[in-house]
């Protein structure tokens, strides 16, 4: 980002949060006149002043960090898929598409957008709910319509004696509190004190360590712990991901960084139980983080165990910031994936055929479409797009 645009983007963030020029100046230890001049004259901002302003923003921001569920996989010990869909998820089963394929050994999938329910003829497999990132966001739209929270949904699941197979807790850094490249550097300098014995790092979409299957970020990505274990952390520069996907300028991204706590099996069970029991996201998330990792600053003459916490890390885990809250970001189901596929794989050929029809006076494309029979799957997807959330949910437990 160009030096002179930094204050423009910073001003936009300040105004979005609702912080006055005077409050920002006072918190940063600047005169109001000097700060106002920086903004109004779009002046170049020295690096030291930038740091003071950034630190002040963290302290003044009402929610510098938020917590989201970014992956939920739950196994229900039952073969009654209708009960799970209608009584637990509280969705109307008639709107779900059934597909004769599955994953993880399941043979059939009921789907509404990215919300997936998998079944198997084997009793020991039960019914599996799979919510990835977009699935979580879409399911939150249904929870909102039902006037339910994640806590209430999980309590309902627990009554079914479920097994939480995987849960990802995403701590979103909205203000650039974490410096991921610096944390990677600290890992290499042994300034990361952790129960885990391994870390892996990537930069600019390229490999720094060794090949990882789900590293698709332009910015820095850090894995702490083994991906084969039931608990590991993934830290990455989310703003770069949004730049690649949506073209969003780095400083304008809603989320700057993300710290993901990825939990499986008993670890996932324990985390959800703690969340539901206490409804204290700060305690649950940072209880896990603090138990397994901390970043320190090396001091000569002292043992590694005595090195002080790094100030940036100290702020992240709770000092000089407001308490972490569980939030939602509900999104409607869209045809984005289908439209992208159509745009890249079908549209060029379709356009060519339409032009040939136009120039040759034929109607091959129209004839093909007129004679195409929609399957039940396609009719249900049309219904999903035509119905409101309230039309597709069950408002009360049966």
What is the role of each PLM region?
Residues 28-29, 39, 54, 339, ...:
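A general structural motif at alpha-helix termini
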Residues 46-62:
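DNA major-groove recognition helix of helix-turn-helix/homeodomain DNA-binding modules
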Residues 1, 42, 52-53:
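N-terminal flexible/basic segments that precede or flank functional cores
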Residues 2-4, 16, 59-333, 338-398:
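Structured, helix-rich domain cores that form ligand/interaction pockets
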Residues 10, 24-25, 35-38, 335:
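Conserved hydrophobic/aromatic packing and binding residues within compact polymer-binding modules
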Residues 8-27, 328:
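Short basic helix-loop element that most often maps to the first helix and adjoining turn
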Residues 29-45:
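Recognition helix of helix-turn-helix/homeodomain-like DNA-binding domains
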